[in-house]
């Protein structure tokens, strides 16, 4: 490809609103252009990277026995009503009505459609296991699109779905998809860590995220040094090392605590450590159930874990007005003693083994001291409900947890019968008995993956693309376009190495302009044809090299084969 006819509108300055390195590089290099907030055009350079990435996905999916197809973008809202997911998505869902007033939506994901079209077509166990996927544009009405392709309102995604007649089949499909995804990420050159994750609105109980460490990441992952534990912070578990020595139980006593509207103020006022205070947090669950959560005051409630425990669609911390109406106390005075108004009291495991603690007295500006579990207040059940802290021991090898910001580039789920039972997708098993199809769901954010690659492979002046998804494998730069010897050599090299996808800079531009643009193209090999062309010598440079090296043209073939084959 001749650069003189290749559409690559580069920018000299970084746009002020581009914060993420990947966003800066893709705008400056002419990979993408914003059409409106969260919506981008993929210019030739960006589209080449996108298509090469999709090709890798297609190859690895075929190797794993996963078959490609395509579903529509526009979906009837009735399918999502049938599955029960429509109200869970809220304002992020793009919704519209056709001329007949029928509710439609633009698909952010396609579990319902695959269940309706595919799972309902599977009548016998003999038709399974089955695995399908599509690469398609998705839509999500993000409140705050940002970071370029990392959080957009329109994006390209691989979404796959598996259908099984048994849990054993699903387990194998899940493992096969995980292995295929790891191969995809390796070939695209992105470092990922599979981590324990929350399934969120997708449903199901078991899921793994693929997280790419990056400074601009919106997620936090918790890992140990030996690599035996990794989890999204939302699901991370740590070992609580605090242990209170047993004490003789004292008589519970109410004390006034004026102005103590924080744990720090309360601890200072009562001259006790936060580990001797039990916080009481009231949650309104599914807008009807009142659940009081107890946790040691030096810890914070993990609402994702709480959602899993309560198996609810929504929860929120009670407003001050709710607290006053239910308990007669303000925020700091709510407590578990005589809390008969609570539908359920659940406690974090940190509450076990505490003696003579401070709890809210059920009225404003007052606390009970020397309160004790079972004697003075109850907990209906215990669970790990706390946010893990960095440095705490992991639950596997008891090594200190390290927190890293990261980008979620993939997510796989064991959905089970979450959709098929609701939507009536059943088959006959070996005994002729009707059973719901067992499903899995698998996704890679393809355009987000491109941003993650740039975040990890950015250079001072551009990007060093991994060889399999680089827009061009070789970038030939001719110094003087009027030099016939240079032109002849550059054209010969372009033809000889055409299979590596060559970009030949034949523009009549200054060397500085050409080299700056070459940094943004980020080809694995840059060949400069200059003053030594008459002697059969060129300069070659890889993105990681400090300096270009001179190389005889006769040695180029072996050098390139060693780098790119």
Swiss-Prot record:
Assembly, per entry: Homodimer.
The organism of origin for this protein: Lactobacillus delbrueckii subsp. bulgaricus (strain ATCC 11842 / DSM 20081 / BCRC 10696 / JCM 1002 / NBRC 13953 / NCIMB 11778 / NCTC 12712 / WDCM 00102 / Lb 14)
Gene Ontology biological-process annotations: prolyl-tRNA aminoacylation
Keyword Disulfide bond: no
Family assignment from sequence similarity: Belongs to the class-II aminoacyl-tRNA synthetase family. ProS type 1 subfamily.
Gene3D superfamilies noted in UniProt: Anticodon-binding domain, Bira Bifunctional Protein, Domain 2
Listed GO MF terms: aminoacyl-tRNA deacylase activity; ATP binding; catalytic activity, acting on a protein; proline-tRNA ligase activity; transferase activity
Location(s) in or outside the cell: Cytoplasm
UniProt xrefs under PROSITE patterns: AA_TRNA_LIGASE_II
Record's protein name: Proline--tRNA ligase
HAMAP family referenced in this protein's UniProt entry, alphabetically: Pro_tRNA_synth_type1
Keyword Protein biosynthesis attached: yes
Domain of life: Bacteria
Enzyme class: ligase
């Amino acid at each position: 490809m001749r650069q003189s006819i290749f559409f690559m509108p580069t920018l000299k300055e970084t746009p002020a609103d581009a914060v993420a390195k990947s966003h800066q590089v893709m705008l400056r290099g002419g990979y993408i252009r914003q059409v409106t907030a969260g919506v981008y055009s993929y210019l030739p350079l960006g589209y080449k990277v996108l298509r090469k990435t999709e090709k890798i996905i297609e190859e690895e999916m075929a190797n794993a026995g996963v078959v490609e197809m395509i579903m529509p973008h526009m979906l009837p809202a009735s399918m999502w009503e049938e599955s029960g997911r429509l109200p869970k998505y809220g304002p992020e869902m793009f919704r519209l009505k056709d001329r007949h007033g029928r509710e439609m939506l633009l698909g952010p994901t396609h579990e319902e459609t695959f269940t309706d079209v595919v799972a309902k077509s599977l009548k016998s166990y003999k038709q399974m296991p089955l695995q399908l996927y599509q690469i398609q544009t998705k839509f999500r009405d993000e409140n705050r699109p940002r970071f370029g392709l990392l959080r957009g309102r329109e994006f390209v995604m691989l979404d796959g779905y598996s259908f099984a007649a048994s849990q054993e089949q699903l387990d194998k499909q899940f493992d096969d998809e995980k292995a295929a995804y790891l191969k995809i990420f390796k070939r695209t050159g992105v470092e990922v860590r599979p981590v324990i994750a929350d399934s969120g609105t997708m449903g199901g109980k078991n899921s793994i995220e693929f997280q790419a460490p990056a400074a601009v990441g919106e997620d936090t992952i918790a890992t140990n040094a030996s690599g035996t534990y990794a989890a999204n912070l939302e699901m991370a578990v740590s070992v609580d090392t605090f242990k209170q020595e047993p004490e003789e139980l004292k008589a519970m006593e109410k004390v006034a605590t004026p102005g103590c509207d924080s744990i720090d103020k309360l601890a200072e006022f009562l001259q006790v450590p936060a580990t001797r205070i039990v916080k009481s947090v009231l949650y309104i669950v599914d807008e009807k159930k009142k659940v009081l959560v107890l946790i040691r005051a030096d810890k914070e409630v993990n609402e994702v874990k709480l959602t899993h425990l309560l198996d609810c669609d929504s929860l929120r911390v009670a407003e001050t007005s709710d607290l006053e109406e239910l308990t007669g106390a303000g925020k700091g005075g709510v407590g578990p003693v005589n809390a008969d108004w609570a539908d359920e009291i659940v406690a974090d495991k940190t509450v076990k083994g505490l003696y003579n603690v401070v709890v809210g007295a059920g009225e404003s500006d007052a606390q009970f001291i020397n309160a004790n579990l079972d004697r003075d207040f109850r907990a209906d059940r215990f669970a790990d409900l706390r946010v893990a802290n960095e440095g705490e021991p992991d639950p596997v090898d008891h090594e200190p947890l390290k927190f890293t910001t990261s980008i979620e580039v993939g997510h796989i789920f064991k959905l089970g019968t979450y959709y098929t039972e609701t939507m009536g997708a059943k088959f006959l098993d070996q005994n002729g008995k009707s059973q719901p199809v067992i499903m899995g769901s698998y996704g890679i954010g393809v355009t987000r993956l491109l941003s993650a690659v740039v975040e990890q492979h950015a250079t001072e002046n551009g990007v060093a693309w991994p060889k399999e998804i680089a827009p061009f494998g070789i970038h030939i730069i001719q110094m003087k376009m009027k030099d016939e010897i240079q032109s002849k050599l550059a054209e010969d090299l372009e033809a000889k190495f055409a299979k590596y996808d060559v970009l030949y800079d034949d523009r009549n531009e200054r060397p500085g302009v050409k080299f700056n643009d070459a940094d943004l193209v980020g080809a694995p090999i840059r060949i400069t044809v200059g003053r030594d062309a008459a002697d059969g010598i060129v300069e070659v440079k890889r993105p990681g090299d400090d300096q270009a090296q001179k190389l005889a043209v006769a040695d180029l073939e072996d050098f390139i084969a060693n780098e790119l084959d």
